[in-house]
Amino acid sequence: MVSRLEHPAGGYKKVFESCEELAEPIPAHVSGEIPAWLSGSLLRMGPGLFEVGDEPFYHLFDGQALLHKFDLKDGRVTYHRRFIRTDAYVRAMTEKRVVITEFGTTAYPDPCKNIFSRFFTYFQGIEVTDNCLVNIYPIGEDFYACTETNFITKVDPDTLETVKKVDLCNYLSVNGLTAHPHIEADGTVYNIGNCFGKNMSLAYNIVKIPPLQEDKSDQFEKSKILVQFPSSERFKPSYVHSFGITENHFVFVETPVKINLLKFLTSWSIRGSNYMDCFESNDKMGTWFHLAAKNPGKYIDHKFRTSAFNIFHHINCFEDQGFIVVDLCTWKGHEFVYNYLYLANLRQNWEEVKKAALRAPQPEVRRYVLPLDIHREEQGKNLVSLPYTTATAVMRSDGTVWLEPEVLFSGPRQAFEFPQINYSKFNGKDYTFAYGLGLNHFVPDRICKLNVKSKETWIWQEPDAYPSEPLFVQSPDAEDEDDGVLLSIVVKPGVSQRPAFLLILKATDLTEIARAEVDVLIPVTLHGIYKP
């Protein structure tokens, strides 16, 4: 995985261009042989509209939500896409301007209104976006597109039509939830979001949405708070993008990237700011690990500490001999990585992209080990006794346990990100293989496989080809953990070929099985699922 491609032609810029939705599915041109058992839909979310009228969106996470679908059946493939009819999208299309403030783009009052109307608009308070561009996941028999606010949007996975908007605040005490829930085999959904805890201080709630019952009753009505994690700072919650789960525990990593609540509450009504303006870094905090028992939900008051890093994606967590093993895609330091994901940065020429990446936090895949049985008299001793890892946990005199990781992969400005595993069989369990999107100075230019035990790596890459997060689909008669395929949408702009394709790789060694090319460019996608 140390090989590095150069991109002087700047073809990666194409994934940040707006596109039009499709009136109906279009056929793909298949080369290779798609496995007969691979019959289903690849659903992907991402930004598809990067400007409205004359007004641009500024950040990667601002573009309007576009739902993509590749249908696979009997060796044939079709591609379809539609914009989700969120309030943010519909109002923007109606008024031909940015109407609701997005992650890094501020919406301003209509310039056509008189001064008194504009003044009143500023003081109406916060209008939270429902632009659900990040992920899509099932709740019961339904599918919901999501971002990280309190709004999720039900969509039809067959027609891609927008069904309805759901406000999670009507059911749960959370200000928002992550776009990375954990879903168990019975359909139980777990997620995490910040909330107001005791004495009006901030906290983080693990929420549980039960599986669909025989009577088909509303699952949201039966959702509940399972356990609460305290916040290290009363009015500054950490940014949370994902969390970990094992058979018996939840793992929450609290990073030094903070949301300044005072800025957040005054941004829209007074200062005219956006979400990115409300982030700041606590350069003295480091990073804290929290644990909670799963059933019954109970916070475990062990004080795990380590040096500062950003974390967006957990790879996997599992329990072993009284320890919890936590594998993460980290970015070193306390500076917020999202500062480097403004579209102006991502669209720069190749040499400028490389210069920016030199200044950014550096990526590293790390393994941390958290002991469950801790005794104060063991000060100064490494509490980790697992024979297969060099990760350590040392009790300090102040009662904290200092963690040092084992590095599973590290390459200068080469990230292993958007990780996937054989989720249905190995989530929360001891595992061997992870799959990821390789970022070269933030440019996605390879698909990676990592053996977390041996640290062996495999890659797929082609010149001027820009893949997406690879999703693992297990073979129906699988005996081995990596017996299956990887699905990734690849953009390959140029005059000599069709500009995008669905790539199907053999998960064991990342050799190509087939590709399904389409005659339209496909903008960047973030996350998604495979629906059999």
Curated annotation (Swiss-Prot):
Binding residues for Fe cation: H180, H241, H313, H527
Primary location class: cytoplasm
Family of the protein in this entry: Belongs to the carotenoid oxygenase family.
GO BP annotations listed: retinal metabolic process; retinoid metabolic process; zeaxanthin biosynthetic process
Gene: rpe65c
S-palmitoyl cysteine lipid modification positions: C112, C329
Name of the featured protein: Retinal Mueller cells isomerohydrolase
Membrane topology (UniProt): Lipid-anchor
Record-linked PANTHER family: ALL-TRANS-RETINYL ESTER 13-CIS ISOMEROHYDROLASE-RELATED (PTHR10543:SF43), BETA-CAROTENE DIOXYGENASE (PTHR10543)
E.C. numbers: 3.1.1.64, 3.1.1.90, 5.3.3.22
Sections of the chain in a coiled coil: none
Catalyzed reactions: an all-trans-retinyl ester + H2O = 13-cis-retinol + a fatty acid + H(+); lutein = (3R,3'S)-zeaxanthin; an all-trans-retinyl ester + H2O = 11-cis-retinol + a fatty acid + H(+); all-trans-retinyl hexadecanoate + H2O = 11-cis-retinol + hexadecanoate + H(+)
Subcellular location: Cytoplasm; Cell membrane
Free-text remark on how the cofactor is bound: Binds 1 Fe(2+) ion per subunit.
Cofactor(s) recorded in Swiss-Prot or TrEMBL: Fe(2+)
Signal sequence annotation: none
Protein's UniProt keywords contain DNA repair: no
GO cellular component annotations of the record: cytosol; endoplasmic reticulum membrane; membrane; plasma membrane
Keywords attached to this entry: Cell membrane, Cytoplasm, Hydrolase, Iron, Isomerase, Lipoprotein, Membrane, Metal-binding, Palmitate
UniProt GO MF annotations: all-trans-retinyl-ester hydrolase, 11-cis retinol forming activity; all-trans-retinyl-palmitate hydrolase, 11-cis retinol forming activity; beta-carotene 15,15'-dioxygenase activity; metal ion binding; retinol isomerase activity
UniProt KW Cell inner membrane keyword: no
UniProt xrefs under InterPro entries: Carotenoid_Oase
